[in-house]
Amino acid sequence: ILYKIMNLHSKDNKSNLRTGLYIVSTPIGNMLDISNRAIDVLKNSYLILCEDTRISKKLTLKYNINSKLISYHKFNEKKNIEKICFELKQKKIISLISDAGTPTISDPGKILIKECISQNINIFPIPGPSAVTASVSVSGFSEKYFFYGFFPEKTKEIEKKLSEIKDLDSSIVFFISAKKLNRNINIIKKFFLDRDIVICKEITKFYEEFFRCKVSDLKPFKNLKGEITIVISELNNKKKASNNLNESDKKKIKMLVK
């Protein structure tokens, strides 16, 4: 029985691909970074929901995927939910993709997923590329990480949000533009001065680069362009020691007080 359940998703038989909404991860830069299963699901989809049909068309052309592309982004996702759920209720296979990476991670889709959950519509993840996990994997920092999403916009919001997470003892990941990074270096230093940082530029693309330094040594970049993910390290040992007392320290203090 377990074997049969596991093989409901087998690509050897199209009829075994279950109907529902598929959250399909696509390449973040290098077109080869897509799984055979993802291609199979996209080929068998009645519709493919995507942020920008022009971008997704490059992927579907490369892999001979003929499924219809439908524009689905933050400005129309609420409006289209009823129609999408209607098609899903008709036992259709619909895929959701983003311009790059794993859908719903700082991309549209959460509203649709919540609606599918409320209507008992099947939802399946097709795992794959993610700028978040890719950047953490090469950082050399703690595997425990907090993903913030896109770096805040306004100065007051930046100050407020960073003050809330400055003491987290984990790696901290942001998506950020080159201009915004240069503009906010002093604020990053203010809240994360004792940590290390890696700046990941154009991950998996031709101009892929990684810049590593201490936050205290961070300086504005010249001619920095492209998509950027930054990973800030966990607290260093000195900072941890100043913030937390271990059990032996607590016992010693109690003895001294007595």
Over which residues does each language-model region extend?
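Glycine-rich, flexible N-terminal cofactor/catalytic loop recognition
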Residues: I5-F75
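Short, acidic/turn-prone active-site loops that include or flank metal/cofactor-
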Residues: P27-G29, T53-R54, S71-K78, P129, ...
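Short hydrophobic/aromatic-enriched beta-strand-loop microsegments
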Residues: N66-K74, I123, E143-G149, D194-K201
